[in-house]
Amino acid sequence: SDLIDVPFDDIVKINIYLKNLSDIEAVNQAYTTFFPDSAIARTVAYVPARTAVEVAGLPMNALVQIEAVVSHGDGTPPQAVEDRHGIVIKPNNTDKAPKCALSTQTVAFSHYNNISAQLPIDPKTGKLVAGGVKEQAAQCLSHIKAIVESIGHKMDDVVKVNVFVKN
């Protein structure tokens, strides 16, 4: 098989699937040994957009499974190898949504923006919003709207949304 040679800085989105969400702190300890990767990434505190989800089970009874979206690689179509350095990866955070030291709210590359999963947190208090699933969903979507608008887009530009619910 052919391998692509890309640095971790080219990762724009990470999805973490955990058998037990209580293991997230241990995952974070490992995660911070990989991100940020390069001196440049550390200087600007670049980390990919990120989602963590608890799942009922994983292949081979694993405790964690991680997937990544990479912005480009040597010769990845439609870019030629020599065009690789012309691709821009642009991270952005807004104060209108909760921030996390381990992820960026949105990471743009090509004509896509990858947005980190949003929890129903009041960005001013850092606490879950009052109410049920309707109020919590509205808060999550308000964060997504604020993030989308902070990069000059509107909700009509969103092409995919993943929703994770307890019941």
Where are these regions (language model features)?
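N-terminal presequence-like segments and the immediate start of the first folded domain
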Residues: 2-12, 18-160, 164-167
